[in-house]
Regions:
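Polytopic transmembrane helical bundles with strong interfacial aromatic enrichment
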Residues: 1-144
Length: 144
């Protein structure tokens, strides 16, 4: 097996894991906000959020970046000249900012300082879906 295919496979596994977390964590926030007055439920949601964020999402994000950088290195630095790759990297930067924003939301929920509604979390839950669709199409078709 070539190194490129190995790292491409590892990159895909990490990205799928990261995306699963990015799609699921806001959904937990919805339930958390809707059950904010129930102490036992709140405690369960806080544990779920913390474990998902720290044990799955953060490592998956780091590995997605690491394996992606390795793939660029294997392909050669000149691959940075491809517009499709620049757009993909920009999209991944946006996903990373979104990831960190979810961490901020998680901390505000835990400290009872959250001002966001469950509807807000339902809406922002679509951000990674839109970016995922965009990334898949530009990577598969490499239009530019």
């Amino acid at each position: 097996m070539s190194g490129y295919l190995l790292f491409k496979s590892l990159h895909l596994i990490a990205v799928i894991s990261w995306m699963a977390g990015l799609l699921y964590l806001p959904r937990i926030f919805v339930y958390h906000v809707e059950n904010f007055e129930k102490d036992q439920a709140t405690e369960i949601f806080e544990t779920m959020e913390r474990k998902l964020y720290n044990y799955i999402m953060r490592p998956a994000m780091i590995l997605s970046w690491l394996f992606g950088i390795i793939l660029i290195w294997i392909n050669g630095i000149e691959s940075f000249t491809y517009l499709w790759l620049q757009l993909k990297i920009l999209s991944v930067v946006i996903l990373t900012i979104y990831h960190e924003y979810l961490g901020k939301c998680m901390r505000s929920l835990k400290s009872k300082e959250n001002s966001k509604s469950s509807r807000f979390f339902r809406i922002i839950n679509e951000i990674p879906t839109v970016l995922l669709i965009f990334i898949v199409f530009i990577v598969v078709f490499k239009p530019m």
